[in-house]
Amino acid sequence: MGEPIYRRVVVKLSGEYFAGPQHYGIDQPTIDRVAGDLIAARGLGVEIAVVVGGGNIFRGVEVSARGVSRPTGDTMGMLATVMNCLALGEALRRHGQPARTFSALLMPEVCDLYTRAAAQQTLAEGGIALLAGGTGNPFFTTDTTAVLRAAEIDAGAVLKATNVDGVYTADPKRDPNAKRFERLTHSEALAGGYKVMDATAFALARETSLPIIVFSIAEPGSIGAVLGGAGRATVVAG
């Protein structure tokens, strides 16, 4: 594994992954393993911020189809991301890694309000910044949040952790002929309609010239491997 390609990154983690084999809620062994991977990556000298989804607990889009208004459903989903970040922060600190949870929603008894300056200070001091609450607004995904926060805090890239090792022409779990891309431009990712991230996230990444690295979180040590240029992944840039 070589020297890290980037010195500051935002890691986007799926809430569904936090559920582990139970497919709902928070699976502690899974959280601990993710925490270990983040700590190992931090040990490479990389400053790390993390955005976590909330789909293991609540999905606003799904309940909006059953009568709950989309703004209310999305706000409930934002609260789920806070729960995930609190769980991950606890695991990180238990393993000796300083971590601080920030939320785009004001909840001072629970965690700090997100500001660019406070998040950057945490990173500069060696802590991992956990960025919860989405953008604080409905209709924006946590993928878009990850790109937005990365642009705000001057990160070099977004590391998008998924259950497959990159962007494919089709779902590789359903189509054995699906081909993996080594590289895509932001425009190609948008034109292809690949579901690994939403169009708003890709468009914002293109506007801010921010690389997105799509990789599988399934293998232990995958975050550090990608940072060192050794892991299988698709780079979306240019």
Curated annotation (Swiss-Prot):
One of its GO terms (biological process) is UDP biosynthetic process. Its main location: cytoplasm. Its EC number is 2.7.4.22. The keyword Nucleotide-binding applies. The keyword Flavoprotein does not apply. It catalyses: UMP + ATP = UDP + ADP. GO terms for molecular function: ATP binding; UMP kinase activity. It is an enzyme of class 2 (transferase). InterPro entries: AceGlu_kinase-like_sf, Asp/Glu/Uridylate_kinase, Uridylate_kinase, Uridylate_kinase_bac. NCBIfam families: pyrH_bact (TIGR02075). Homohexamer. Belongs to the UMP kinase family. This is Uridylate kinase. It comes from Rhodopseudomonas palustris (strain HaA2).
